[in-house]
């Protein structure tokens, strides 16, 4: 059936529901689980400005990559609670492309995504993820309907 499953997450409630469904399915069929989340790089100019204005011993603010690492760790905790081993796959760039790239590279059998993205300005961008994934996936796609 399914040997390897990819699930995309952005830390939203919808994505967390997709993670929970993917974890349950992976546990039921004994599949490997790959958790994918995308981040945007911090522009070099902004990094240089922050370095000039910050005291030398200051802690750097959490950046986009660190946010994704935390998102993936939170999703991994859900899987580990259920005894499912996971691989964390942070990727730079578009969320749908990140999911599709991992699915193709790892030759997975199933992609799991939520049907909605985050609210506000990000909703438009993230709402297109399930659509793009379902049209370009190299494998089956399970879109989790959420409220």
Descriptions of predicted regions:
Residues 110-135:
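Glycine-rich, Arg-bearing micro-motifs that act as flexible, cationic patches
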Residues 54-70:
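A short acidic, glycine-rich active-site loop
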Residues 50-54, 105-107, 129-130:
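Short, hinge-like loop/turn segments at secondary-structure boundaries
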Residues 1, 14, 28, 74-111:
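Structural beta-alpha unit
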Residues 37, 114-116, 146:
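Short secondary-structure boundary segments
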Residues 123, 138, 146:
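Short, conserved catalytic or interaction motifs in soluble domains
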Residues 42-43, 96-98, 120:
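Generic structural signal for helix capping and beta-alpha/helix-loop junctions
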Residues 3-55, 82-89:
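Small/aliphatic-rich secondary-structure junction motif
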